[in-house]
């Protein structure tokens, strides 16, 4: 009997310690995959075997782990990429800005079609045809289309992971507070005033993503067969949402245990040791008169798409700051025929962490991406944010609220307005740095208490351990309101009945 008990215990431990996991991360964004890579490597270090469906950006499996990492190249076709870029160029403002007005189902359909093409890739089709079994499916939260893999590998439960903020639809899926025009605004918004117009914007965004889900349903049935469940039904399999974010940035949203805020900065947890700057850049920074201003709009922004007037607005601003050395990450092709001010140094790439930690660094002009702001907080460098897409608008707004940055409207900002914001963070640097130190200390305190990567792995393994009984309320992390239509959640029929009964008495 004792031997049987030990065998049962060993079987249970093995089920968790050597799980077969499928991860599906189709969005070809470098800033997303530097987060996913760390998470996947941590799973492999815990002896899990992970198969990753991803674009060919960079390799995940760079070391030898207790578990295996198998990469399935799901690169989109060159033609599809060109089509996506061409279509998006038609609605971007100033060449690069995709604000709330541009967030429509029609504009985002190209992204869903890109996912479809990736899953039609011969490598992915071969994976599906192999009839391999998995104990867990992990998909990126931004790509609901990828939830179909939870259906293909049923009964494996599903986890969604985001490199930063979650979508309102993600919170709906797991039963968290998803929407409020003021306290929990949709991350696709670019204006955060307490106005009736923004209430209408929230309603429009809800409708657009409903339309996009219906478009996705049609493509799913076309690709995987007429019996493929809808997005709404596929969401029922999601048991956990992991967010690479500290809850303070999300207004301390009330959430059930099915949402775990990891604290942010996961890409820094196992980053390579800080390397030295090139001697040339180091020398340029050391001899700067008043300091150095670093300008980078991240890895997802194509600087070749800058509208000319926006490009020259930036150049004219930098020219005015002639006491400062400007390090500007921009494609060489953009500026090769432009005579730049003497204080401006451009490159395709800079060692961002090393630049930000240099003793002469004074300010950081950024798109407001989460990974960039993590590195700015780490270095204590005040930011001026020019958000251009996605959650950058909300994050920039939140950074300004917390007193560590200035946020500007990239669609309308002028050289004078940008200069005022830059001078503000330069001349009031002690105040900004104080706020940054306080925020960084708070975040680090919580990370020391709940290490981000440990938290992600432990909750992942909890879902794996109880995968056979996940439908039982005893084991579920979700609330009973998870994925419930708003008409049912707000009990419209009951409310209507009460109102009608009340009216009949008059």
From Swiss-Prot:
Post-translational modification comment from the UniProt entry: Glycosylated.
Highest taxon listed in the record's lineage: Viruses
Pfam families named in the record: UDPGT
MF GO annotations: UDP-glycosyltransferase activity
Signal peptide span: 1-18
Alphabetic keyword roster: Glycoprotein, Glycosyltransferase, Signal, Transferase
Protein name: Ecdysteroid UDP-glucosyltransferase
Organism annotation: Autographa californica nuclear polyhedrosis virus
Gene transcribed to yield this protein: EGT
